[in-house]
Regions:
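Bacterial Sec-dependent N-terminal signal peptides
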Residues: 1-24
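N-terminal, motif-rich segments that launch catalysis or mediate targeting to/interaction with membranes
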Residues: 19-126, 133, 138-263
Length: 263
């Protein structure tokens, strides 16, 4: 189904800690987003950014490293209530900051170039982040705050091996790091081949619906992955399909949102 070759899963376990999708994943999503922008939107985006979406996609990660902007760390996370609904109005939540940034872009004539730049950078990053399942928190489900499980290589005896895997890094970097031998452009094209038939379906809705949709994926994933569980490699790999789907949704939805804003 996919043209990407199968890489040894254990190699991806050496992944660096990430704060959301790692840079490679962000760049891949951004490339796929750019592939789905109409010409008018491309020109409007370039006029504001003075560069490409791909080159600006991790700006918010850089911003949070500034001690004076440490409060923005919470913007990378998205809270759902116990019913899986996005109802929060907390200024520290990612969905609220995303909605504020969208409002600026929809009312550009009343905002400075600097404000538009900050807003566009924020939209680019947070639409992507809300599709990283480890950044969705659900009230009453403690596991969504993070946990560690173990992966088993499905061998017994002397060949048996197990290693720790964090919930955060599984979605942030483990799967995408399996494809870093390719460029973000190539990876984006591969995802598009897999997902393009679902583009119209994936592009529907608005940001709060997207977070709720992700919350449903989180609940399903936690049925197989939980604190202290020993999980066979092949079971973990079944979640790679969902990771790819999340990246596709992020790109198609971001493109649809920007095309609508700049129509």
């Amino acid at each position: 189904m996919k043209k990407i070759v199968f890489l040894m899963f254990a190699l991806a376990m050496v992944a660096n800690e990430a704060f959301a999708f790692n840079t490679f994943a962000h760049q891949t999503i951004s490339k796929l987003t750019e592939m789905n922008l109409n010409e008018k939107t491309k020109q409007e985006v370039k006029a504001i950014l003075k560069t490409s979406i791909t080159k600006e996609c991790v700006w918010l990660n850089t911003l949070r490293k500034n001690p004076e902007m440490a409060h923005t760390k919470s913007w990378h996370f998205f809270q759902l209530d116990a019913n899986g609904k996005s109802t929060t109005m907390d200024e520290n939540d990612g969905i609220v900051q995303l909605e504020k940034a969208i409002a600026v872009l929809r009312n550009r004539k009343n905002h400075s170039e600097a404000e538009q730049l900050t807003a566009l950078r924020t939209v680019i990053h947070l639409v992507q982040d809300l599709h990283c399942l480890s950044h969705i928190r659900i009230e009453g489900i403690e596991a969504t705050k993070g946990f560690t499980f173990r992966i088993w290589n499905e061998l017994d005896g002397k060949g048996r091996k197990e290693w720790n895997q964090k919930w955060y890094t599984l979605w942030e970097s483990t799967f995408s790091n399996r494809y870093t031998i390719f460029t973000p452009q190539y990876y984006a094209e591969d995802i598009d081949i897999y997902a393009r038939d679902k583009k119209a379906e994936y592009s529907k809705g608005e940001p709060r619906f997207w977070v709720e949709n992700g919350g449903e994926d989180v609940v399903r994933a936690l049925k197989l992955l939980n604190t202290g569980a020993v999980v066979p490699t092949q079971v973990v790999l079944t979640h790679e399909f969902n990771h790819t789907k999340c990246m596709a949704k992020a790109a198609y939805r971001l493109a649809a949102l920007l095309n609508d804003i700049f129509k």
